């Protein structure tokens, strides 16, 4: 104990030692107090930070309203005390003042600021460029604070612009309400139309089902129609072959009629001569009775006339005339047969189209309109062949009453022959002439009458033969057309047959398509049901929307809500009132550590005052002084922070206790280093201080530090002092504080034990050195 008292006596009696120790008592206060006072609440005085605003905005028009966002911002800033606002129109001068550190921030509002705000509804809207200029090289913190001011300005401008947009939007809500009302009416019409469509869809579904069944029947009937068309084609081909034979017969008739025409012409000529001779004979007959007396003299004359009549009759070539009459009979029979064949042919042509129509009309599964369309389709496939006008041909042919009376002609010819025979006998009967005068006169009369009939018959024969020849010629022309038409009919019927087979294929496709249509119509009917439900709901919702939109009554409070809808609330678990409070754990720990290092400079840590009895007494004679200095340092700095600067803590007495524990732990570390190693130990203590400045986590979170600092973070004593101070000052987590205090006490005990060990070794060494001279 003598050593301890001697140590305090030396301090009190030595001003060179006492005054420095007293000064050391205030080192933590000077370090911590001065620093914390200077930066206790720098953000609370940013209203003194000079910032200049350069407004170059020219304004714009949006939806009929004048936009002056730049001017509005300037007016708002003039009523804002967050910064020391200055306003200018000269950008170049403001930038020069920034370089000269007159301002820490230059805010530039460009000339198109409001104009860009009016492009919000354009295809390519432009953002509002709020430019700012800082000079971080002159003062980084000032530039950083200025950037935070820009964030606030950005929020303010965004709010102002949004309010302008919101006003325009709400002004248009009435138009929107009207449009929604109109849309509701339109949706109602859509709903009504959808109902009609739903009903039509049901009918369509039903009819398509019928169509599906009918198309199968159509396919079967079309196959039958195709077979019938093939049979018609075969019949037409037979008809065409028969027409060829008819044409050959017609040519033969034409040749015979030409021969008959030649014979009838010759007959007419000879009959003229006969009639003239008979007329001469007839003229002489009245005088026959009167000239009986002159008969003898006239016999010669009568014989000559008889010879002349005989020549005329011989010249007639009655054989040819009979042949012509027989040919005429044959022609009449051929003409009758020919007329019958023409009539049959005409009927076959007329029945051609009817055959197709009968097949189609016989279908009981087609409607009248479908039958008409199918008949038109078939008729388009048939070539339009103009059949010859058979009625005209038949009218031009001579009828039976127009031909000469063949029986009469034959009878007259027989009479002529008989009379000629009598005339031939005239020379021989001259002697009997007188007795038969009456008979001769009657015979001549009959001969004349018969000759007239023959003449008239030959005239009719000639006229009839002429008409017959012309009719047959016309018939040949029309028959040629009929033959050509039959050939076209053959071609057309083949095309129709081919078309019907295509129609058969098409009907099968129609059958397949109608089946798909029937299936699709079912889906359509289901979809229309869903659509009907949706259109009804759409109409109702649009009406509700129109009513609700029309009821909107916006005011400034509404505009403000849209412009700034979010209100932030800082519900901190443990709040820190200012910047200085947040830095106190870090700065206070450094002050106490620096105070310990300064003490080792003015207070001798090794030289004993008197003779210590052992190493512990030697250690404690030094440590009790350092412990008292540490406690006083802690009390002074803690009291000034609490009462002088205004530090607020969660527990005052715990704050005092933890400050003392921290100071004693740091002193124990520094004592060991300085005692055992002298100045190199002090240097190591300074190195530890420097490492703790970066690695203890006093400013930025540990996760933001480089990896090396994160590794050594747990080995540094300030790490635990800072965490403990945060717990007692801000968090109120006293359990965590005592945990950190336990770590510091453990470090202090280890350092004290090492120091005691060193002093014990040193004390033994001193004792050994004293004993050696004595011996």
Curated annotation (Swiss-Prot):
GO terms for molecular function: ABC-type transporter activity. GO terms for cellular component: plasma membrane. Its main location: membrane. Keywords: Cell membrane, Membrane, Transmembrane, Transmembrane helix. It is found in: Cell membrane. The keyword Transmembrane applies. The chain crosses the membrane at residues 16-36, 585-605, 625-645, 655-675, 742-762. This is Uncharacterized protein YhgE.
């Amino acid at each position: 104990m003598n050593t301890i008292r001697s140590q305090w006596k030396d301090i009190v009696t030595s001003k060179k030692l006492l005054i420095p120790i007293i000064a050391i008592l205030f080192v933590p206060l000077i370090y911590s107090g001065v620093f914390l006072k200077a930066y206790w609440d720098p953000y609370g005085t940013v209203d003194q930070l000079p910032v200049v605003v350069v407004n170059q905005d020219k304004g714009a028009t949006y939806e009929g309203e004048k936009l002056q966002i730049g001017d509005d911002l300037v007016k708002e800033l003039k009523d804002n005390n967050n910064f020391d606002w200055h306003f200018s129109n000269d950008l170049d001068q403001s930038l020069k003042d920034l370089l000269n550190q007159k301002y820490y921030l230059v805010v530039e509002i460009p000339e198109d600021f409001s104009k860009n705000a009016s492009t919000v509804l354009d295809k390519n809207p432009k953002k509002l460029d709020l430019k700012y200029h800082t000079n971080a090289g002159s003062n980084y913190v000032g530039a950083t604070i200025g950037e935070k001011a820009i964030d606030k300005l950005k929020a303010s401008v965004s709010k102002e612009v949004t309010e302008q947009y919101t006003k325009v939007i709400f002004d248009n809500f009435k138009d929107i309400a009207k449009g929604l009302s109109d849309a509701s009416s339109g949706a109602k019409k859509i709903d009504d139309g959808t109902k009609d469509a739903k009903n039509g869809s049901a009918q369509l579904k039903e009819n398509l089902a019928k169509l599906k069944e009918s198309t199968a029947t159509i396919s079967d009937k079309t196959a039958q129609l195709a077979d019938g068309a093939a049979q018609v084609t075969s019949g037409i081909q037979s008809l065409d072959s028969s027409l060829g034979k008819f044409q050959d017969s017609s040519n033969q008739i034409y040749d015979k009629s030409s021969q008959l025409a030649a014979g009838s012409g010759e007959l007419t000529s000879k009959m003229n001569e006969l009639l003239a001779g008979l007329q001469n004979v007839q003229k002489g007959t009245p005088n026959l009775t009167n000239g009986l007396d002159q008969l003898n003299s006239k016999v010669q004359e009568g014989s000559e006339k008889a010879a002349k009549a005989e020549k005329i009759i011989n010249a007639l070539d009655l054989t040819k005339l009979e042949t012509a009459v027989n040919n005429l009979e044959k022609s009449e029979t051929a003409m009758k047969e020919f007329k019958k064949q023409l009539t049959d042919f005409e009927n076959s042509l007329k029945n051609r189209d009817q055959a197709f129509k009968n097949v189609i009309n016989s279908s009981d599964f087609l409607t009248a309109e479908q039958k008409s369309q199918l008949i038109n389709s078939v008729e388009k496939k048939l070539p339009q062949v103009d059949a010859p006008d058979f009625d005209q041909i038949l009218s031009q042919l001579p009828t039976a009453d127009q031909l000469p009376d063949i029986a009469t002609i034959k009878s007259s010819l027989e009479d002529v022959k008989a009379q000629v025979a009598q005339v031939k006998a005239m020379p021989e009967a001259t002697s009997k002439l007188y007795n038969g005068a009456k008979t001769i006169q009657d015979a001549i009369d009959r001969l004349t009458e018969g000759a007239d009939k023959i003449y008239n018959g030959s005239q009719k024969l000639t006229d009839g033969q002429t008409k017959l020849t012309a009719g047959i010629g016309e018939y040949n022309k029309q028959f040629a057309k009929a033959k050509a038409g039959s050939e076209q009919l053959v071609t057309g019927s083949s095309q129709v047959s081919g078309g019907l087979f295509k129609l058969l294929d098409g009907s099968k496709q129609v059958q397949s398509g109608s089946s798909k249509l029937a299936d699709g119509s079912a889906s359509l009917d289901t979809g229309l049901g869903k659509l009907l439900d949706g259109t009804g709901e759409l109409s109702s919702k649009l009406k509700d929307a129109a009513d609700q939109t029309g009821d909107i009554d916006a005011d400034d409070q509404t505009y403000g809500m849209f412009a700034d809808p979010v209100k932030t609330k800082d519900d901190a678990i443990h709040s820190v009132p200012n910047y200085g409070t947040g830095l106190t754990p870090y700065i206070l720990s450094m002050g106490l550590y620096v105070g310990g290092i300064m003490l080792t400079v003015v207070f001798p840590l090794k030289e004993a005052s008197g003779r210590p009895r052992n190493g512990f007494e030697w250690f404690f004679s030094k440590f009790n002084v350092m412990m008292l200095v540490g406690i006083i340092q802690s009390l002074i700095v803690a009291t000034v922070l609490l009462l002088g600067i205004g530090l607020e803590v969660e527990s005052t007495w715990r704050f005092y206790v933890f400050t003392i524990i921290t100071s004693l732990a740091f002193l124990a570390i520094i004592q060991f280093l300085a005692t055992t190693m002298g100045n190199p130990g002090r240097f190591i203590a300074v190195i530890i201080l420097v490492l703790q400045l970066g690695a203890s986590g006093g400013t930025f979170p540990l996760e933001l530090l480089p990896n090396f600092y994160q590794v050594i973070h747990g080995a540094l004593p300030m790490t635990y002092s800072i965490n403990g101070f945060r717990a007692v000052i801000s968090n109120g987590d006293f359990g965590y504080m005592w945990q950190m205090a336990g770590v510091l006490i453990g470090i202090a005990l280890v350092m004290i034990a090492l120091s005691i060990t060193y002093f014990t070794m040193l004390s033994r060494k001193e004792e050994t050195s004293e004993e050696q001279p004595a011996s």
